[in-house]
């Protein structure tokens, strides 16, 4: 795992087309902005896990 330190307004790049910018830091919360191509899915981890579980669940009527 790569660990970086960033200040408000600073960014990091993933590849050539994904940018993550620190927008605000308040207490233990960090607000980030993500710029990515439309074909790249961006989800919070807990939402991604729900989507994954729903796709893996057996469908009713099959």
UniProtKB/Swiss-Prot annotation:
Localized where? Cytoplasm
Query: InterPro entries from the xrefs?
Result: CsrA, CsrA_sf
Q: Name the UniProt key words of this record, in alphabetical order.
A: Activator, Cytoplasm, Repressor, RNA-binding, Translation regulation
Cellular component terms (Gene Ontology): cytosol
Name a single GO biological process. positive regulation of translational initiation
The record's annotation in SUPFAM superfamilies points to:
CsrA-like
Q: Name one GO molecular function term.
A: mRNA 5'-UTR binding
The family note in this entry says:
Belongs to the CsrA/RsmA family.
For this protein, the record's PANTHER family field holds: CARBON STORAGE REGULATOR
- Summary of the function given for this chain in its UniProt record: A key translational regulator that binds mRNA to regulate translation initiation and/or mRNA stability. Mediates global changes in gene expression, shifting from rapid growth to stress survival by linking envelope stress, the stringent response and the catabolite repression systems. Usually binds in the 5'-UTR; binding at or near the Shine-Dalgarno sequence prevents ribosome-binding, repressing translation, binding elsewhere in the 5'-UTR can activate translation and/or stabilize the mRNA. Its function is antagonized by small RNA(s).
Q: What is this protein called?
A: Translational regulator CsrA
> Whose protein is this, by species?
Pasteurella multocida (strain Pm70)
